């Protein structure tokens, strides 16, 4: 399929990579298709690829407007992104590009500088008098995660945590998914309004305990890997349960949806 051709191209470009950033490749597509559409489609393509074949329908829908030459540029952008994250692990590659070219000041889309994220993480995790370590639940939550910078900062201190990000922006959710997945961090991302509890999309990022390969799984109302609609077609769903990974189960059934009492 075209997706596997894309994979082979990515591998080839990674072997022959230079210091060209992913944004430079996307800018070559922007005059024809628009910068916002190109960036959003790039994120969606990457998430589909990281879903390991479970999002073929959405993948082909996303690449439909582009010809072979343009898809080749997406391959180069993906390879450049992987190499950039390999050179600078646990550092957000999306926020600066998004804020410079695409953020909406009227919506308050200003991303927290990474230095401030590190300071917040140190303040939150600083030992306190009579502080007792929590057993079992080892999650860190950012209810307005943006591109996931605060979660990446927390991962620099402890990668073994489960990282949970919430954002009302679908684009921000995709950025966080990619940041968690390509840094091999277990976590969950929810496209939702954290104030009203309206939820549109849920994803799990799970790193296989044996192969150490991270994979993205979309979960909706207890159904794993259900083909999604495009972002514009999403309808709000009530938050009625908690999604939890289940250990020691076969891959097809390792996610449990627990209804609230």
What kind of region is each of these model predictions?
Residues 1-13, 244, 248, 258-259:
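N-terminal amphipathic/basic-hydrophobic helices that include classical n-h-c signal peptides
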């Amino acid at each position: 399929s075209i997706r596997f051709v894309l994979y082979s191209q990515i591998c080839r470009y990674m072997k022959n990579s230079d210091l060209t950033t992913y944004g430079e490749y996307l800018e070559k597509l922007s005059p024809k298709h628009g910068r916002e559409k190109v960036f959003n489609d790039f994120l969606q393509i990457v998430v589909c690829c990281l879903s390991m074949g479970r999002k073929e329908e959405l993948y082909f829908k996303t690449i439909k407007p582009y010809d072979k030459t343009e898809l080749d540029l997406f391959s180069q952008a993906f390879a450049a992104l992987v190499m950039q994250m390999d050179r600078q692990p646990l550092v957000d590659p999306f926020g600066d590009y998004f804020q410079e070219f695409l953020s909406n000041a009227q919506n308050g889309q200003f991303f927290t500088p990474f230095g401030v994220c590190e300071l917040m993480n140190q303040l939150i995790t600083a030992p306190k008098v009579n502080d007792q370590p929590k057993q079992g639940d080892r999650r860190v939550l950012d209810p307005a995660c943006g591109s996931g910078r605060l979660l990446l900062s927390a991962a620099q201190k402890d990668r073994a945590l489960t990282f949970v990000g919430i954002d009302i922006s679908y684009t921000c959710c995709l950025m966080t998914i990619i940041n968690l997945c390509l840094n091999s961090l277990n976590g969950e991302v929810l496209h939702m309004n954290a104030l009203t509890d309206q939820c549109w999309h849920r994803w799990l990022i799970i790193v296989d305990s044996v192969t150490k390969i991270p994979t993205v799984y979309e979960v909706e109302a207890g159904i794993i890997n259900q083909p999604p609609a495009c972002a514009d077609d999403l309808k709000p769903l009530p938050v009625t349960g908690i999604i939890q990974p289940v250990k020691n189960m076969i891959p097809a059934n390792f996610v449990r949806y627990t209804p609230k009492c």
